[in-house]
């Protein structure tokens, strides 16, 4: 944001120079990122002096050139060849001396050099208006007052404004400082802290006078929530023309291009007071009627830039009796603005809902000075005052008259905030005691009204325009930035607390698993926790009432917190596959959020998503597609790495998956995974099979903290392997057999593996064949055949009893 030093001094008459002022503003939290000199004339007329033409003779070799002798003062007389028809002896003229830099019409610099023109030496240039950037005239040189002494700097004689422009890196929360008036308020508070008491200079509105009421507008506001306050007034008999130099220079200093006296006046008040205004050509307002309302989705509207836009049903519009004229608070329409033919205007000043403006501006990809301020929240109390100030200025610049009463629709006043500050809490947070009277003075200097002061704290009223100061902590921050961070002493003691190292460190576990997944060919992703509420419509598993809704969303697509990691993973997968990434393996650590009647729930998760092949194809072999069992192997490998085993399996009953499993331990779900339902993947434009896993990371971490891990030495006695080929029902899973086996033989059974599955011919209907491998080992001795047979018989009997299994 650009702030003019000269403009700033219109509001606060400080004798501090620009450098000191910039340093104080930075200390106050308005960081000065750059300071740039500005001149209303390119180059500031540096090197231009007043010369006295002593003689003027015809050039011997050119009919249109004259050879002059010019006195530049201090006994310096130079010869200059000039082609202007009006140059004559005795004139006082502006002279660009050798080495002076001038600027052409496009702003490109060029330098005056000593040279010869048609054989005559020329040691400078006598300048016309356009050559100095003072106007457009080029039919002759400028002739100055004859009483000006030769050698006088042209910048002292001609109308040149020199200024300093601050580039302020304004943080989004400081909507109150988005104007010269707002910056001046902070500067006053900072100066008062340094015992320099200055009052703000408020633009007067005493000249506001209604000449007649011949041009009235009927204003209707359909939705008071979208437009809490709407003001307007008509001005007639205006003359559209170029703005005076003082106004053009103010706007040019902050990189605004002057347009005409009416538009420039609205821009001037916007950057002066922070209140956006809009001038409508009154003759183009059908029915002398202003309707502030929304229009149906799909309505076409052409903005000032000539772009036809399709409106959304939530876009607030300024309409007349027949048509839309302006996107409220964002951008004007192509047919409603001020032109050279305009003779009367309706001047609008309003307070629009910040959330509504932000959504509309983002939907249409627009970012204007008005929307920038409206979406951050302006001062609702300034709306009428700024209108009066701008109306007076327009009347002065255009010769117009006010021809209606001020319309002010403000049914529900926006209230100031009430905050109580505890002194002890303030001092504890600041780290140093600040006297109560100092705190009171700082608050008063920030226009925060002190209601009452007690032994324990201070009650106050925060102005509505300070929408960033709503809590006790915010008030403490305000006190601290004005008091000065540099004034807080450094304690002689260093207080520190050492975190307990007992238990599992979450970040170490996360890094361990991330490294493992990376080694397996996965890439880590990071998705937005904000998502679209429409995703809940893709599944009955997720409920719309469980959405945690954002109060001020950037867009509808980012208006709720995610209930599941799945949809962000599918967005990333779709993004990659659309860019020809055939084999995708991604993982993400993140949180999910759910809203319940009495509480909100936030849980940690780890998600995996896989599509395509297990690995890239090589020249020597073709790699198979990543299937359910490959994916299960990755998941169990992660759990094994964490020392979690002996978990049970159960099928998932969720429309998120076409098939899937949950792995559980101690009646807690560790992970749910499976093949994502095609109805969901197609919504994201993904046609291939997608595997997704959702680790309940918070549950896993809690189990790791409660599990007692026992370290044992490797046994010196051999392992023994035995196999079973079992004929079982199709409904029986390997996990069921595995868990039953470990329950049956708890001491000597070490491992159970499934190494073959057969279904098809030669088997009874509804049956399948599993080939299982059992690993047995005694830590203290070598197992005998008798012991082994006894264990295997026990397992066989248990399988027969529990599952109706038979040996093949």
Language model features: what each stretch is:
Residues 1-211, 346, 369, 379-380, ...:
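Phosphate-backbone binding interfaces of nucleic-acid-interacting proteins
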Residues 2, 444-448, 468, 472, ...:
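A carboxyl-terminal module marker
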Residues 5, 23, 27-28, 40, ...:
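Glycine/proline-enriched, intrinsically flexible loops and inter-domain linkers
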Residues 49-80, 260, 266-335:
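Conserved mixed alpha/beta core segments that line enzyme active sites in large multi-domain catalysts
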Residues 74, 115, 291-331, 335-338, ...:
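Class II aminoacyl-tRNA synthetase-like tRNA-binding/catalytic domains
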Residues 118-133, 137-143, 154-164, 291, ...:
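Mobile "lid/hinge" segments at catalytic clefts and subdomain interfaces of large enzymes
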Residues 187, 191-221, 398-426, 433:
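Terminal amphipathic helices with adjacent charged low-complexity linkers/tails
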Residues 419-582, 775-779, 787-808:
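Extended, well-folded interaction surfaces typified by the phenylalanyl-tRNA synthetase beta subunit core
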